Amino acid sequence: MITAVANETSELKASYNLGYVWLISIVAAMGGLLFGWDWVVIGGAKPFFQRYFELTSEAQIGWANSCALIGCLIGALVAGALSDKFGRKRLLIVAALLFAMTSIGNALASNFAIFIAWRIFGGVAIGLASNLSPMYIAEVAPAHIRGKLVAINQLTIVIGILLAQYINWFLVRNLPAGATDEFIRNSWFGQQGWRWMFGLTAVPSFLFFLGMMLVPESPRWLAKNGKSERARGILARIGGEQYARAAVADIESTLASEEVQHVRFSDLLEPRMRKVLVLGVILAVFQQWCGINVIFNYAEEIFRAAGYDISTVLRNIAWTGSVNLAFTFVALGVVDRGGRRPLMFLGSAGLAAIYILMGFCYHGGVKGLPMLLLVLAAIGCYAMSLAPVAWVVISEIFPNRIRGAAMAVAVSSLWIACFILTYTFPILSAKFGPAGTFWLYAAICVLGFLFIKMNLPETKGKSLEQIERELVD
C-alpha cells in the first residue's frame, strides 16, 4: 500500500504539466459560468416576459422565478448515480447540451407553460453542473493546487452572473424612461428583447459542449471502474510517470478494502461514511443559510429599505457584482496558501459581525452609504471564503467509492437550503423586520463557526486519498 508520506513525496517530485491541468479545469468550470448565467438571467428578463405572458398574480411571478429550483434538485439528485455509472465527462456533456437546448427553448417559448417547462429543464442542467464541475476538477487536480482549481468554478459562476447582468442591461439600455406596461408589451423589448437574453446563453453552452468533448475522463472514475491503464495515461500527462504510478496505486489502495460496486444511497449511512456525509451536508446547507444569497436575490428590497431609489438600486447591484468578482480573485490566491479552515472561520465570523452591524443600522434608521458599504463588505467576505471554499471542501472530503452519490446528497441539500432561504426571507422580514432577520443570519453564522471549528479538518495540500484515510479509516 502506498502511504500518505509516499504520496506527498511523489507530489513534491512530480513535474506538472500545469498548462494542461489549468486548461481542462477551465473547460470543466464552464459549467459554473453557465450555472451563474442561467441563475440570474431571469431577473433581467422578468419585467418583459411578465408583460408578454400577461402574468398578473404574485403566484405566477414567483413560480416563474423559482421553478428552476425543481430542476436543480432533480439534476443534483441524479448526478451522483449517473456520473458513477457513465462517468463525469459524459454527464457534463449532457449538461452542456441541456443548457443549449433550454436557452433556445426559453427564447422560442410561445406560452407560459412551455416557458416554465424549459426553465425546469434548465434547472436540471444547473443541478448537474453545480455537482459535477467541482467534482471533476477535484479528481483531476494535483493536491497542492486543487483548492485553487476548484475555486475557479466559483470564479466562473461569478463571471457568468456578471455577463448575464451586463447583457441584460445592454439589450434594454434604450428602453424609454417611464415606459408603460402597454408600451413594453408591444415593443421590441417585450416581444423579442427578453428572448435574446435567454437565447444568447446558447453561445457559451456550445463552447462548453465542444470543450468537454476534448478533455479526458476523470482518472479517479476510470481507476474505480477497472480502467487503471487509461487513468495512468491521463495522470502521466498531468504529472509524469512517477506521479501517475503513485497516484493510481494510492487510489487503488483506498478501494482495495471495499468491493467496487453500484453505490446505493443506503451505503452512505454506513457508520464509517455517515460522519463525513453529515459534514458535507451541513457545510453545503451553511453556505446557503449564512444568508448572503438573500442580498443577491432581494437586492432591490434590501437597498430600498436602506433608503435608495430605483435608479440608485441598479447602480448598487452593479457594485455588488463587481465586488463579488474582485474578491473571488482574492480567494484564488489564498485558498491553497491560507488553508480551508482559516478561510471558513473568516467567512462565518466576518459575516456574523457584518450582519450584527447591519441589524443595528436597520434598527436605528441608518440609511445610505453606511448600508451600501456593509452590503459590499458582506459580499466581499463571502466571495473570498464561504463561496469558493465550501465547494472545494465538499468536492474533496468524500471517499472515492461514494463520491458521486455523496456529492449528489450534499448538493441537493444545498439547493433545498437555497429554496428555504429564498422563500422565508420575505416572511421573516415581515415578522421580525430587516434588523431581526439579519441578526438571525448572524446567529446562524456563529453556529457555523463553532461547527467548523469542531468538525472540519484541514485538507490543504493533501491528496483525496489522504483525506479519505483521515476522515473515514
Named regions from a protein language model:
Residues 235-239, 251-252:
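Extended, hydrophobic alpha-helical segments
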Residues 2-230, 236, 257-473:
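Alpha-helical transmembrane bundle of multi-pass membrane proteins
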Residues 241-246, 469-473:
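Short arginine-rich
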Residues 244-256:
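Short, well-structured alpha-helical segments
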